[in-house]
Amino acid sequence: MYRNTLEIPALDVSVIYIAQAFKAAVILGLLCLLGFEYLKWDMLSLITWNPYGLLMAWPILLWAAAWAGANTMTGRYDQKFKEARTRILSRAVWTSIQIGFWEELIYRYLSFGIAMILLPFIDWITRGVVRWIFESFLMPATHLMTFGALEGQILTTPWTVGAGIITANPVFVAAHVYTGHSIISCVNAWFVGLVLFWLALHYGLITSMVAHSVYDAVLLLTQALKAKCVKTRSRRLPV
């Protein structure tokens, strides 16, 4: 069992994310065959990028620096690795790139699409209760917590778009519970996830991928620099 992200070999990270993305893509593909008309957002329009969006991502990048500083001061980054520091740093960079790409694809794209198709079906089963809960409580609450940044998606589009955002975001949070096992970590993941949704829907999925990678690079590089690297000597056989 790995205690932190940097302990996971880069190849294992790739395998884990590829498996998750493949499963989500298969589910979305099957659902599209059955209920494509419920997909109320042009998913292909998300696959774009706007460099201006990276400038608008400064709040979460500043927050990443503050979060990394807090982890450093509390001793959370006081770890030991039996590897050279350059190896740890290179793995931190590569892992950050993978996290940014795969998590945005899985949670801001595939999970979002799955939620938009499934929610009308679940609402039909519950005879409108699900939609009533979203429109009466969850959407207004999310609108307030995001200071209206997602108003165009949560309040002024078909209800499944806003509900899809609110449904997919906890899936992202659940995937990050291991990083802290605390309420603070869950709240952090919730708000960061919503900011990344905002970036993806306003500036494109590729923009949110880059911002997400930089966010994680700040955290992982700080962790790699703070950690103690214990050099291991290779044993030579006697001549």
Give each language-model segment a name.
Residues 89-239:
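Transmembrane helix-loop-helix hairpins at the membrane interface
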Residues 4-18, 34-106, 110-157:
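Juxtamembrane helix-loop-helix connectors linking adjacent transmembrane helices
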Residues 23, 40, 80-82, 226-231:
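Context-gated lysine
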Residues 20-34:
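A generic, lipid-embedded transmembrane alpha helix
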